[in-house]
Curated annotation (Swiss-Prot):
Entry protein name: Erythropoietin
Signal peptide: 1-26
GO cellular component, as recorded: cell surface; extracellular space
InterPro entries referenced in this protein's UniProt entry, alphabetically: 4_helix_cytokine-like_core, EPO/TPO_CS, EPO_TPO, Erythroptn
Disulfide-linked positions: C33-C187
Role description: Hormone involved in the regulation of erythrocyte proliferation and differentiation and the maintenance of a physiological level of circulating erythrocyte mass. Binds to EPOR leading to EPOR dimerization and JAK2 activation thereby activating specific downstream effectors, including STAT1 and STAT3.
Glycosylation sites per record: N50, N64, N109
PANTHER family: ERYTHROPOIETIN (PTHR10370:SF0)
GO biological process: cell surface receptor signaling pathway via STAT; cellular hyperosmotic response; embryo implantation; erythrocyte maturation; erythropoietin-mediated signaling pathway; hemoglobin biosynthetic process; myeloid cell apoptotic process; negative regulation of calcium ion transport into cytosol
Similarity-based family: Belongs to the EPO/TPO family.
Length: 192
């Protein structure tokens, strides 16, 4: 029940190009605009949050990890340009990715790593990579790199976490909040 040999190579090349964030013919360029796609990643993040809430005495980080503030001032968000929103989302994803990679290292160095935690950390890393590729296809990276000169980019508010529970709560909240708001606006703007 494997993939026929005639399809294996094109499929492999497509996955390789997607993982590098390059456009692929036949790949929907605005896949992130399908709400079901983002909801899948949000559901995975929420599952990780729920699992780690049950293990409050789980492994703590030996140092604090910096993560983005997930609070959204809706008035301020609406008045921001889509370029400013893109910058905030890219900065947040970058901080989350770095924190989750560091959490993966904590598990790797743990004397008794939890398989469940490892599974959710691996899913989060995979999810963040996929979301990054999907946002590139949407053009978010171009918006984040070249905000208009008139726009002053305000540094992203941050704070620190010291447990897996807090890390996954931030991850889940960021996807449900700022990322969802940004993609919704960017997709609507692209439909005009």
């Amino acid at each position: 029940m494997g993939v026929p040999d005639c399809l294996a190579l094109p499929l492999l090349v497509t996955f390789l190009l997607l993982s590098l964030g390059l456009p692929v013919l036949g790949a929907p360029p605005r896949l992130i605009c399908d709400s079901r796609v983002l909801e899948r990643y949000i559901l995975e993040a929420k599952e990780a949050e729920n699992i780690t809430m049950g293990c409050a005495e789980g492994p703590r980080f030996n140092e604090n990890f910096t993560v983005p503030d997930t609070k959204v001032n809706f008035y301020a968000w609406k008045t921001m340009g889509v370029e400013e929103q893109a910058v905030e989302v890219w900065q947040g994803l970058s901080l989350l990715f770095e924190a989750i990679l560091r959490a993966q290292a904590v598990l790797a160095n743990s004397s008794q790593p939890s398989e469940m935690l490892q599974l959710h950390v691996d899913k989060a890393i995979s999810g963040l990579r996929s979301l990054t590729s999907l946002l590139r296809a949407l053009g978010a990276q171009k918006e984040a790199i070249s905000p208009p000169d008139t726009t002053q980019v305000i540094p992203l508010r941050r704070f620190t976490v010291d447990t897996f529970c807090k890390l996954f709560r931030i991850y889940s909240n960021f996807l449900r909040g700022k990322l969802k708001l940004y993609t919704g606006e960017a997709c609507r703007r692209g439909d005009r």
